[in-house]
């Protein structure tokens, strides 16, 4: 018999899972229909679609972890599972990073030759960013697969067993350090791009207030809404990365409040940010409304 707090947690996990599948599915379907109609896809739509697909798989794995935690289902420990998880996790992280870089290059106003060059060519670089991420993540997975025999038992026994001994601690420590370091690279790139974008939007907002003080101008709230959207992206992305680092380096036990809270927060990022993307994109928002209205009519 499940305890009451575990039942509540599982209901929240189900809602989170369904929201993540729905929001990311909307992004994939809308951009897929546009691709079929126009035989081409805009660079931003391509990046959003790839990010949404990776988040769907990430959401599936997070829900699988929740089911394991709640119902104590046996997890199959093998290098294939470790490689798949690492591939999905790293790929989603890099694609989200490139999305932050794309927004920064398109929106921010910085008078620097390198930034101007990036601003003019960012659209053409998007396919290469995606391809480069795929190749890089694949190489990382091959590297870690050699040590999966140590990594997989370590992370699973750390959560599921209180009396576990791990062999070859030196090798394991190197792997954990490299695992955390790999998260740091996209995180630093993302932080630099998004903080630069926030600074640029904040400066633009102050200039508008000084220019049109006391008057109402159409579109005046657009920079503020964009700033809030980017700030929410930053908070979700940063908290997601930090919790992954904590789970990788510290010791927790399942069914404890802190562990359940961390897993729930990890799942908020791929669903919550995709919802923000839909609300901030007129095309995605309109198609999401059409889908909901069509679903109500079919009932």
UniProtKB/Swiss-Prot annotation:
Known function: Receptor that may play a role in the perception of bitterness and is gustducin-linked. May play a role in sensing the chemical composition of the gastrointestinal content. The activity of this receptor may stimulate alpha gustducin, mediate PLC-beta-2 activation and lead to the gating of TRPM5.
Carbohydrate attachment residues: 163
Keywords: G-protein coupled receptor, Glycoprotein, Membrane, Receptor, Sensory transduction, Taste, Transducer, Transmembrane, Transmembrane helix
UniProt-listed Pfam families: TAS2R
InterPro entries named among the record's database cross-references: TAS2R
Extracellular side: 1-9, 77-81, 146-178, 244-257
Sequence ranges on the Cytoplasmic membrane side: 31-55, 103-124, 200-222, 279-299
Full protein name: Taste receptor type 2 member 1
Subcellular location: Membrane
Miscellaneous field: Most taste cells may be activated by a limited number of bitter compounds; individual taste cells can discriminate among bitter stimuli.
GO molecular function annotation: bitter taste receptor activity; G protein-coupled receptor activity; taste receptor activity
GO terms under biological process: detection of chemical stimulus involved in sensory perception of bitter taste
Flavoprotein keyword on record: no
One term under GO cellular component: membrane
Protein topology in the membrane: Multi-pass membrane protein
């Amino acid at each position: 018999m499940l305890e009451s707090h575990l039942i509540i947690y599982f209901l929240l996990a189900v809602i989170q899972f369904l929201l993540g599948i729905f929001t990311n599915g909307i992004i994939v379907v809308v951009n897929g229909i546009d691709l079929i109609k126009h035989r081409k896809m805009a660079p931003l739509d391509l990046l959003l679609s790839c990010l949404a697909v990776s988040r769907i798989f990430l959401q599936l794995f997070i829900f699988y972890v929740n089911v394991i935690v709640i119902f104590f289902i046996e997890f199959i420990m093998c290098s294939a599972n470790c490689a798949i998880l690492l591939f999905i996790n790293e790929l989603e992280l890099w694609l989200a990073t490139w999305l932050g870089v794309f927004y920064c290059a398109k929106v921010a106003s910085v008078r620097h030759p390198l930034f101007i060059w990036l601003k003019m060519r960012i659209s053409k670089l998007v396919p290469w960013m995606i391809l480069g991420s795929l190749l890089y993540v694949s190489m990382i997975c091959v590297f870690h697969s050699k040590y999966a025999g140590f990594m997989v038992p370590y992370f699973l026994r750390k959560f599921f067993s209180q009396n576990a001994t791990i062999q070859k601690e030196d090798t394991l420590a190197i792997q954990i350090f490299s695992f955390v370091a790999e998260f740091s690279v996209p995180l630093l790139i993302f932080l630099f791009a998004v903080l630069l974008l926030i600074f640029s939007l904040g400066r633009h907002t102050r200039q508008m207030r000084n220019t049109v003080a006391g008057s109402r101008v159409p579109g005046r709230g657009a920079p503020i809404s964009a700033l809030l959207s980017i700030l929410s992206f930053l908070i979700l992305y940063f908290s997601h990365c930090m919790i992954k680092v904590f789970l990788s380096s510290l010791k927790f036990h399942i069914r404890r409040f802190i562990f359940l809270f961390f897993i729930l927060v990890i799942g908020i990022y791929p669903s919550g940010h995709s919802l923000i993307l839909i609300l901030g994109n007129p095309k995605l928002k309109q198609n999401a409304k059409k889908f909901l209205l069509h679903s109500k009519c079919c009932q």
